[in-house]
C-alpha cells in the first residue's frame, strides 16, 4: 500500500485529494501509466449581481480542462443573460497537450456590500444534476430543487454569507488522457490563422432528421419568407462539427433558398451563426442537393451551447405579390461534439442559483482544480515528469468508498461550514490506520471498516507495525491470531483447553511505543520451549475488519490483556494488547463466537462468561458477569469487537470483576490492572505494563490498580492470590490500591493514573506518592491539587507549566484564561470544530440553578457598588430583584437593612433638605458673576444664588437656573457704580486728518511758537 514507511498513518492520497482538493493533487493509482506532472490550478472570480439580485452559476465539475463554468444574471423579463465564462487561472492548452482531472472543489459566497446597503441578504440553492445542461426543464430558483431526488446532491436556502461548496466526485474510473485543443505549428496566408489539435476521444454525436418530405407553401413577400426547419437540443463547450445534406424539390421557376445554422446558448441568444446556403436557385422538377459540413473550433464557443437551429429563407427572382412559393425538403445531419462523451465533460452539471442579493453586490467564486498534465514538447524540456503508480488497493478502496457515498454522507454540494467540519472525517476516511472515532460518532464506522477489509491487504491495515510480518507469513489476520493466541496477565486458551501461558525466552523485543515505556528483557523462563528471536510488539490493539456492535450507556469495568501469537519455531511472533470489558448479567450475545459457551464459577456460585473454565474463580460476587473484547470507547459507549479471541483468565480480569461487583460504575471509564502476569515462571521486571498502559492511553482512559505491584509468585499461581487478596471486603486493608471505596451513586470515580511517567521510579518517590495519596483521602483540597499535578504529569507538560509560572507569578494570565476559555460543545467551539468529536452536549442549567446564579450575580454587582446588605439570600427574598430606590434611600439614611419586598415610598418622594454653606454659595456666585480678577459679586446677586440653592434643597442650579443667573449678573454689572467707565468706540466713518501744507513725511512743520 501507499506510504508503508509511515507506521502511524497509511494515507491514500487519491481519495484524500478527491474529498479535500485543497490538499493538493495526487496521481490516479490506475493502470494508465503515462509520464505526467501534477498541477493545482486556482479559479477566483468576483461576479457582480445584476439589477434583479438573482443569478445562476453553472459548473462543469468533471470537465477535464480549463473550463470551470459560466455565470448568468436574471433579467427583469424572467430570462437569463450570459455574463462570463469561469476558467482556471492558467490557460492549460497554451503549455500542455494532454490532461486528466484528479479533483476539483469550488466555493460560492458573498461577503461584500455595495454602497448604501447595510445588511447581507440573499440565499443560495444548489443542485447537482446527473444530466446535461440542455436537459434541464426548470431553471428557476425553486424549480432547480426538483432536478434530482437525491438528498446528497442538493441543498436549499443557504445564506450567501455562509456560501456553498461544490465537490467534484468521479462518475467513472476508466479515464484516459484528453487532448486539450492546444495550438499546433501551422503557416497560412492569414497571420491570425489558428490550428489546434482537439480531442477525438469519446465524441458525443447527435443525429437529426432535418426534413422528411416536408411540404412548404407560401405567397411571395419582399425579403423572403423565413421558416425554421428544425431546432434540437445539443450540449457543447468544446469544438464540434456539423455535417449533412438537404434535398429540395419544387415546381416553381425562379425559386431561391438560403439556409443558416444557429448555435444557441443557454440564455437563448445565438452564439454562432453559419450560412450553409446563400441564394441557391432551385431547378424545377429535379432534386436539388444542398450538402454542408461545418467545423466550429473551441475558441469560438464563448458560452455553453444548448441547442441548434436551421432556418430557411425562401424568395423568388422577379416575384410579384401573390405569386406562389412552394417546395418540399428531406434530409438529415449529424452534430459531433469532440470529447463530449468523456466522463464529466458535459454531465453531470452543478447549478448554483442565488436570489434576493443586493444589486451591485459581489459574489465570489473561488476554487481549486487538480490535474495530471502532459506538457507540450517545448515545456517538457524544462519540466520533470514521472510515471503514475499502479496501486490496486488504493484504487479499489476509493471505488468502494465512493460507491457507498450516499450511506457515508459524502455529498456533491455542501454548506461551506458543514464541509469544513467534515474535513477531519475525510482525513479519517483517507487514513487506513485511523481509529474512525469521528466516523463512529456519525454511524459510518462499520461500513468503512468492512470496506477496508475487502479493498486493502488485511494485516497491513489492522496491524501496521506487523506489515512486514504479514507479508512474510502471507496469511490473513484470522490465521495470525487463530485459536493458538495466548495472553499474559489474562491468558487466552486454545481450542483444546490447554493453557498456553508460557513462551520461550525473548532475546530481542522491539516495542513500538513512546519513551518512558519499559521493555522486558527476559519474560519467561520455562523448560521445553524454544528460544525465539525478533518478537515484534505494538501498543495498539489488534483489530479485525468486522462490523462493530455498540453498547450505549453500559456500566462496565475495563481491563487490558496482553496477547502473543504462537505458531511454531520458524514463525515470528507478535505481541499486542487487547482491552476487555466486564458487563453485568449474562450477555453472550455481545461476545464473539470464539468466547461463547465458556464460563467459570465464582466462590458464591455465580458465573463469569468469557473466562476459561479453569476451576473456581477466587472471588465472591453477588451476580453474573460477562467479559467481552472491545475495540473502542466513545461517548460513554462501548464499541464491541468481533475478533476471534479465545476465553481468558488473569489477575487483571479478577480485579476488574471485583471492582465491578463493589462499585458498579455507571459509565465505562474504569480500567483495572494488577501489573502482574498469570504465568508459571519468574519475572525480572514488571511485565507487559507498558503495553497495557499504551492500550489504555490510546482510548483516553486511566488505569486503576496497584500498577507496579512487586510480587514474586514463583511457579505457583495460588501463592500470588494469597499475597494479593481479591475479596472486595479486604480491599480497605490494602494501602497500595488506588481504588477508593465510594457509594454506587457517587457518579464518575476518580483514580490516580498509573501511566508511564517521565519520572524515574525510586523507593523515595514511591513513599512520597503514597503519602500524598493518604493526604488526598483526608483533605479534599489537597486531592484537587494532586489531581492537577497528575494531569500535568500524565500529559507531559510539567516542565512547560513550571516555566509558565515563572512568567505569571500572580496567576493573572492563567485566571483570565480559565475565565474566558470556551467549553467543549459551546457555540464558538462548534463553529470552529463542528459537532463531530464532541460527546453529550453540555446540559443547560435548571430554572432553580439559573435563578440562584442570577441572585449571586445581582449580589456581586451590588457589592461592587458598596451596597453590602444585598446578599444572594436577601435578593432571593426580595423577589430575585436588586434593591429598589426606596430601599436604597432607607439604607442610606438609616444604615439599617431594609425589609425585602418593602418599597419605602416615603423615602423616595419626601426629599430630605440639605442646606448649602455660605462659603459654597459665595464660591458659586463668584464663579457665575465673573472670572477671577474682576469685581466681586454684589450682595444682591449672592442672595439670588442662595435662593436657587434653597429651592434645589442644597443642590446647585440646573441649566435653566444658570441661564437666569447669568442674565441677572449682566444687568447688575451695567448698573454697578464701581464698574470702570466704558471706553469710547471709534467712529468708523470719521475721515483721517491730513498733515498741513502737504509737507513730506519727514519734514517738521514750523509753528508760531518756533518763530518767536
UniProtKB/Swiss-Prot annotation:
Pfam families noted in UniProt: Birna_VP2 (PF01766), Birna_VP3 (PF01767), Birna_VP4 (PF01768)
Cleavage, annotated site positions: 441-442, 487-488, 494-495, 501-502, 512-513, 755-756
GO biological process, alphabetically ordered: proteolysis
Annotated region described as Disordered, given as residue ranges: 837-857, 968-1012
A cellular component annotation (GO) from this entry: T=13 icosahedral viral capsid
Entry-linked InterPro entries: Birna_VP2, Birna_VP3, Birna_VP3_dom1, Birna_VP3_dom2, Birna_VP4_Prtase_dom, Viral_coat
Ranges where the record places region Interaction with VP1 protein: 1003-1012
Basic residues bias spans: 975-986
Annotated GO MF terms: metal ion binding; serine-type peptidase activity; structural molecule activity
Posttranslational modification: Specific enzymatic cleavages yield mature proteins. The capsid assembly seems to be regulated by polyprotein processing. The protease VP4 cleaves itself off the polyprotein, thus releasing pre-VP2 and VP3 within the infected cell. During capsid assembly, the C-terminus of pre-VP2 is further processed by VP4, giving rise to VP2, the external capsid protein and three small peptides that all stay closely associated with the capsid.
Sites where the protein binds a divalent metal cation: 30
Keywords of the record: Capsid protein, Host cytoplasm, Hydrolase, Metal-binding, Protease, Serine protease, T=13 icosahedral capsid protein, Virion
Enzyme Commission numbers on file: 3.4.21.-
Domain Peptidase S50: 513-755
KW Metal-binding (keyword) present: yes
Active site: 652, 692
Keyword Mitochondrion: no
PROSITE patterns: BIRNAVIRUS_VP4_PRO
Cited function: Capsid protein VP2 self assembles to form an icosahedral capsid with a T=13 symmetry, about 70 nm in diameter, and consisting of 260 VP2 trimers. The capsid encapsulates the genomic dsRNA. VP2 is also involved in attachment and entry into the host cell by interacting with host ITGA4/ITGB1.
Name of the protein described by the UniProt record: Structural polyprotein
Organism: Avian infectious bursal disease virus (strain 52/70) (IBDV)
Amino acid at each position: 500500500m501507499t506510504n508503508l514507511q509511515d507506521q502511524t498513518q497509511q494515507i491514500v492520497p487519491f481519495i484524500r485529494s478527491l474529498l479535500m482538493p485543497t490538499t493538493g493533487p495526487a496521481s490516479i493509482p490506475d493502470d494508465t501509466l503515462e509520464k505526467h506532472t501534477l498541477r493545482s490550478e486556482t479559479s477566483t472570480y468576483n461576479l457582480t449581481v445584476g439589477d434583479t439580485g438573482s443569478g445562476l452559476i453553472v459548473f462543469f465539475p468533471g470537465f477535464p480542462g480549463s473550463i470551470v463554468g459560466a455565470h448568468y444574471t436574471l433579467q427583469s423579463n424572467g430570462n437569463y443573460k450570459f455574463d462570463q465564462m469561469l476558467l482556471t487561472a492558467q490557460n492549460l492548452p497554451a503549455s500542455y497537450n494532454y490532461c486528466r482531472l484528479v479533483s476539483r472543489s469550488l466555493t460560492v459566497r458573498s461577503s461584500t456590500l455595495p454602497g448604501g446597503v447595510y445588511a447581507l441578504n440573499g440565499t443560495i440553492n444548489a443542485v447537482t444534476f446527473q444530466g446535461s445542461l440542455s436537459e434541464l426543464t426548470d431553471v428557476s430558483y425553486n424549480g432547480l430543487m426538483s432536478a434530482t431526488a437525491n438528498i446528497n446532491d442538493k441543498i436549499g436556502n443557504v445564506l450567501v454569507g455562509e456560501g456553498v461548496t461544490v465537490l467534484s466526485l468521479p462518475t467513472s474510473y476508466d479515464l484516459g488522457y484528453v487532448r486539450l485543443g492546444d495550438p499546433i505549428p501551422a503557416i497560412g496566408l492569414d497571420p491570425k490563422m489558428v490550428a489546434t489539435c482537439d480531442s477525438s476521444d469519446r465524441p458525443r454525436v447527435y443525429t437529426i432528421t432535418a426534413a422528411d418530405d416536408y411540404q412548404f407553401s407560401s405567397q411571395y413577400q419582399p425579403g423572403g419568407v423565413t421558416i425554421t426547419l428544425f431546432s434540437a437540443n445539443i450540449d457543447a463547450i468544446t469544438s464540434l462539427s456539423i455535417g449533412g445534406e438537404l434535398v429540395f424539390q419544387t415546381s416553381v421557376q425562379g425559386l431561391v433558398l438560403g439556409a443558416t445554422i444557429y448555435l444557441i446558448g443557454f440564455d437563448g441568444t445565438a452564439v454562432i451563426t453559419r450560412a450553409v446556403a446563400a441564394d441557391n436557385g432551385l431547378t424545377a422538377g429535379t432534386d436539388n442537393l444542398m450538402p454542408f459540413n461545418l467545423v466550429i473550433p473551441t475558441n469560438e464557443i464563448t458560452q455553453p451551447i444548448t441547442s441548434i437551429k436551421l432556418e430557411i429563407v425562401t424568395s423568388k427572382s422577379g416575384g410579384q405579390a401573390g405569386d406562389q412559393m412552394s417546395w418540399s425538403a428531406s434530409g438529415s445531419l449529424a452534430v459531433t461534439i469532440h470529447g463530449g462523451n468523456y466522463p464529466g465533460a458535459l454531465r453531470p452539471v452543478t447549478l448554483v442559483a442565488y436570489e434576493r442579493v443586493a444589486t451591485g453586490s459581489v459574489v465570489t467564486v473561488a476554487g481549486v482544480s487538480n490535474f495530471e498534465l502532459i506538457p507540450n514538447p517545448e515545456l517538457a524540456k524544462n519540466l520533470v515528469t514521472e510515471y503514475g503508480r499502479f496501486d490496486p488497493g488504493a484504487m479499489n478502496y476509493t471505488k468502494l468508498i465512493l460507491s457507498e457515498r450516499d450511506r457515508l454522507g459524502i455529498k456533491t454540494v455542501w454548506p461551506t461550514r458543514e464541509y469544513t467540519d467534515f474535513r477531519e472525517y475525510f482525513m479519517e476516511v483517507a487514513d487506513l490506520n485511523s481509529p474512525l472515532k469521528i466516523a463512529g460518532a456519525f454511524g459510518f464506522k462499520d461500513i468503512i471498516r468492512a470496506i477496508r477489509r475487502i479493498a486493502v491487504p488485511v494485516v497491513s491495515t489492522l496491524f501496521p507495525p506487523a506489515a512486514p510480518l504479514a507479508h512474510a507469513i502471507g496469511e490473513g489476520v484470522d490465521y495470525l491470531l487463530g485459536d493458538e493466541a495466548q495472553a499474559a496477565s489474562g491468558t487466552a486458551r486454545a481450542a483444546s483447553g490447554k493453557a498456553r501461558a508460557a513462551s520461550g525466552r525473548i532475546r530481542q523485543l522491539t516495542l513500538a511505543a513512546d519513551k518512558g515505556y519499559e521493555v522486558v528483557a527476559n519474560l519467561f523462563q520455562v523448560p521445553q520451549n524454544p528460544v525465539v528471536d525478533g518478537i515484534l510488539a505494538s501498543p495498539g490493539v489488534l483489530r479485525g475488519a468486522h462490523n462493530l456492535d455498540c453498547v450505549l450507556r453500559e456500566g462496565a469495568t475495563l481491563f487490558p490483556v496482553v496477547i502473543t501469537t504462537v505458531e511454531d519455531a520458524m514463525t515470528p511472533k507478535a505481541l499486542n494488547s487487547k482491552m476487555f470489558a466486564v458487563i453485568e448479567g449474562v450477555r453472550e450475545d455481545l461476545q464473539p463466537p470464539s468466547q461463547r459457551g465458556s464460563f467459570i464459577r465464582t466462590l458464591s456460585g455465580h458465573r463469569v462468561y468469557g473466562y476459561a473454565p479453569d476451576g473456581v474463580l477466587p472471588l465472591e460476587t453477588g451476580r453474573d458477569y460477562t467479559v467481552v473484547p472491545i475495540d473502542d470507547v466513545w461517548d460513554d459507549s462501548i464499541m464491541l469487537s468481533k475478533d476471534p479471541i479465545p476465553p481468558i483468565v488473569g489477575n487483571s480480569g479478577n480485579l476488574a470483576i471485583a471492582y465491578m461487583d463493589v462499585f458498579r460504575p455507571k459509565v465505562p471509564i474504569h480500567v483495572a490492572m494488577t501489573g502482574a502476569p498469570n504465568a508459571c515462571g519468574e519475572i525480572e521486571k514488571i511485565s507487559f505494563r507498558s503495553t497495557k498502559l499504551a492500550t489504555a492511553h490510546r482510548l483516553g482512559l486511566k488505569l486503576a490498580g496497584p500498577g507496579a505491584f512487586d510480587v514474586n509468585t514463583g511457579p505457583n499461581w495460588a501463592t500470588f492470590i494469597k499475597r494479593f487478596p481479591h475479596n472486595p471486603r479486604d480491599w480497605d486493608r490494602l494501602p497500595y490500591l488506588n481504588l477508593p471505596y465510594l457509594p454506587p451513586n457517587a457518579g464518575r470515580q476518580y483514580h490516580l493514573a498509573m501511566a508511564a511517567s517521565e519520572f524515574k521510579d525510586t523507593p523515595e518517590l514511591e513513599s512520597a506518592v503514597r503519602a500524598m495519596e493518604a493526604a488526598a483521602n483526608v483533605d479534599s483540597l489537597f486531592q484537587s491539587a494532586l489531581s492537577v499535578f497528575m494531569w500535568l504529569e500524565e500529559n507531559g507538560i510539567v516542565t512547560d507549566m513550571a516555566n509558565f509560572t515563572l512568567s505569571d507569578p500572580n496567576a493573572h494570565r492563567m485566571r483570565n484564561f480559565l475565565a474566558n476559555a470556551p467549553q467543549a460543545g459551546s457555540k464558538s467551539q462548534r463553529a470552529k470544530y463542528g459537532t463531530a468529536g464532541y460527546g453529550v452536549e453540555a446540559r443547560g442549567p435548571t430554572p432553580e440553578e439559573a435563578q440562584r446564579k442570577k441572585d449571586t450575580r445581582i449580589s456581586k454587582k451590588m457589592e461592587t457598588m458598596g451596597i453590602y446588605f444585598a446578599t444572594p439570600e436577601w435578593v432571593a427574598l426580595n423577589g430575585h430583584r436588586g434593591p429598589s430606590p426606596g430601599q436604597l434611600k432607607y439604607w442610606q439614611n438609616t444604615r439599617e437593612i431594609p425589609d425585602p419586598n418593602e418599597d419605602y415610598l416615603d423615602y423616595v418622594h419626601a426629599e430630605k433638605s440639605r442646606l448649602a454653606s455660605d462659603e459654597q454659595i459665595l464660591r458659586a456666585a463668584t464663579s457665575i458673576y465673573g472670572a477671577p480678577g474682576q469685581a466681586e459679586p454684589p450682595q444682591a446677586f449672592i442672595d439670588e444664588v442662595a435662593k436657587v440653592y434653597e429651592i434645589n434643597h442644597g443642590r446647585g442650579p440646573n441649566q435653566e437656573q444658570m441661564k437666569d443667573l447669568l442674565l441677572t449678573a449682566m444687568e447688575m454689572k451695567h448698573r454697578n457704580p464701581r464698574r470702570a467707565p466704558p471706553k469710547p468706540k471709534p467712529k468708523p466713518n470719521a475721515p483721517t486728518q491730513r498733515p498741513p501744507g502737504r509737507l513730506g513725511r519727514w519734514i517738521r512743520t514750523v509753528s508760531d511758537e518756533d518763530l518767536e
